A protein has these predicted regions:
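Canonical Radical SAM [4Fe-4S] cluster-binding loop centered on the CxxxCxxC motif
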Residues: 50-98
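Acidic (Asp/Glu)-rich catalytic clusters
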Residues: 107-115, 142-150, 170-180, 213-219, ...
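Auxiliary Fe-S-binding modules of radical SAM enzymes
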Residues: 1-32, 36-39, 264-366
Length: 366
């Protein structure tokens, strides 16, 4: 036993359960009003790691129709509940542009008068290059606005690989000129079986590699999202899987790796398992073991390692025990590691909580 749950699940049964949970959650949510389409889901500024320095991120979450993978017959990924933030119907491009401008004008003065450089992250709970979410003309309008903001040095968007093509990469590079571009892709793991039978991602590692090589041709970076502790893995399996994924991606020359410990999102299969006490979000101890095993200081000269867990320290997010001091300490160490890109930060764990023994015993006997 390698720590990965040997009980394989029929993919059709997995999809059926994902779709059922999704429909139930969306029905309870009801139809969204058109009144909210002029403003984004959320936007914020906070400290973040840029390629070669500590700066700030300006994140905008746009409300679009949502992820086509989640809206389709497959029901989407087993851990994802972001479809509940979407409109689930076509959002006119002018509304999406208004959302972007609303966020930008709210923060423009702060950005322009800040000494820090910025990374702009545009998320839309789906794929930036999916024409049904964000069409070509809208993308061009966004590029032209961004190009005129000198403080923004890096731009990150997200997309499933089937929407990434030469034309879209060329357009983005042409309009954004000297800004560093990175495309976030939800790979989740380099293991095809786990990705498609436990997560229901619907892509192969080979397809990811092809997308990476295509982006490299256009000098566009790729940020691979890795899921830490997918459903049906225990802590040991999660450590093994993510360690292997990190090493594989580093060796292939990936630009950035963003490790995402699962947080329990509403309407997801993972929430269904969590309610049944068949899933627990990962421990910080497991994440730190993975990072210590997988990342060497010399790796960080060429690869950016990121990790900003949602719901950290709560029952639904990565946590040890639920003591504030314990989780707060681990969170601070993780933040310092990411900001400084220095593995020595991971060993700054002089805080010893009694829950560490409980964690070790659980891992030894489960």
């Amino acid at each position: 036993m390698n720590g990965i749950n040997d009980k394989s699940m029929n993919n059709e049964a997995l999809i059926e359960r994902i779709v059922l949970n999704r429909k139930k959650a969306l029905k309870q949510k009801g139809k969204k009003s058109t009144e909210g389409l002029e403003k984004p889901v959320a936007f914020w500024i906070k400290r973040d790691r840029l390629l070669n320095e500590i700066g700030k991120e300006f994140t905008i979450i746009l409300r679009t129709r949502g992820c086509d993978w989640a809206l389709g017959k497959t029901g989407g990924c087993s851990m994802c509940g972001y479809i509940q933030d979407s409109y689930k119907d076509t959002v006119p491009p002018e509304n999406i542009l208004s959302q972007f401008n609303f966020a930008l004008e709210s923060k423009r003065h702060e950005i322009e008068h800040d000494n820090n450089n910025y990374i702009l992250k545009i998320f839309n709970s789906g794929s930036f290059f999916d024409e049904r979410e964000i069409d070509k003309n809208l993308r061009t309008s966004l590029y032209n606005i961004i190009a005129d903001i000198p403080k923004i040095k890096e731009v990150v968007v997200e997309s499933r690989i089937e929407y990434i093509d030469r034309k879209k990469l060329e357009e983005m590079k042409t309009h954004l000129k000297d800004k560093y571009i990175e495309i976030g892709i939800g790979l989740e793991t380099v293991n095809d079986y786990i990705r498609n039978n436990y997560i229901n991602k619907g892509i192969s590692f080979k397809e990811f590699q092809e997308a990476f090589e295509l982006c490299k041709e256009y000098e566009v970076g790729v940020k691979a999202y890795l899921l830490f502790k997918p459903p049906f893995l225990n802590e040991t399996g999660a450590i093994e899987d993510c360690t292997n994924s990190i090493r594989t991606l580093i060796n292939m020359g990936i630009n950035s790796i963003s490790i995402n410990p699962i947080n329990i999102q509403r309407g997801s299969l993972v929430e269904y398992l969590w309610f049944q006490k068949r899933y627990r979000p990962p421990w910080y101890y497991s994440l730190f073991t993975c990072l210590k095993n997988a990342v060497k200081q010399e790796d960080l000269e060429n690869v950016r390692i990121l990790c900003d867990p949602s719901g950290a320290g709560t029952k639904r997010g990565i946590h040890n025990c639920l003591k504030k001091d314990c989780n707060g300490h681990m969170k601070n160490i993780l933040e310092n590691f990411v900001l400084n890109q220095d593995v020595r930060e991971l060993y700054n764990d002089e805080f010893n909580c009694s829950c560490k023994l409980k964690y070790k015993l659980k891992n030894a006997y489960l």
